[in-house]
């Protein structure tokens, strides 16, 4: 939709209806000057993919995706890749049971310090390169019993890991 809109700085999508949208892939890909974006109201009920949705949005410090409905989602490959100013992300309320690809989710997110995720006992996830090029002093919050064992092994030893 806004693929490579490199001059885009701020956008308000409040009046657009996304109820029938099933793919948000590449929506803001390459919007390297985007500083302000509110996607908290997006209707993502039918979405199957958020692949590279925010790829290269290097000036975004925060992205509120905490209310995304992800029951039907299968792919979040590189969703926040190269969001080099992103400081924290809350995906704790996401339904991850159908997601099978989170590879390179945070690649190049060099300022990311706080991640909240929930894996809903998803045993089929691929974690290839999920934390590649992350700082060594971040924090990760997870809920007990949510299949985080594979992922926890990939976190840097210096990270603060908290179980809720």
Question: How would you describe each model-predicted region?
Answer:
Residues 1, 22-23, 27, 49, ...:
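Small-residue (G/S/T/A) turn/hinge positions that recur once per unit in extracellular repeat modules
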Residues 129-131, 147-161:
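Short, aromatic/basic amphipathic alpha-helical patches
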């Amino acid at each position: 939709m806004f693929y490579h809109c490199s001059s885009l700085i701020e956008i308000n999508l409040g009046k657009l209806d996304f109820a029938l949208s099933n793919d948000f892939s590449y929506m803001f890909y390459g919007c390297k000057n985007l500083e302000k974006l509110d996607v908290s109201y997006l209707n993502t009920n039918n979405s199957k993919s958020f692949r590279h949705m925010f790829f290269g949005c290097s000036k975004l410090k925060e992205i509120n995706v905490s209310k995304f409905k992800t029951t039907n989602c299968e792919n979040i490959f590189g969703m926040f890749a190269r969001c080099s100013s992103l400081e924290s992300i809350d995906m704790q309320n996401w339904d991850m049971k159908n997601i099978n690809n989170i590879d390179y989710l945070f690649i190049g997110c060099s300022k990311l310090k706080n991640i909240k995720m929930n894996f809903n006992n998803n045993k089929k996830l691929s974690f290839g390169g999920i934390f590649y090029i992350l700082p060594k002093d971040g924090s990760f919050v997870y809920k007990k019993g949510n299949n985080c064992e594979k992922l926890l092994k990939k976190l840097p030893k210096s990270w603060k890991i908290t179980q809720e």
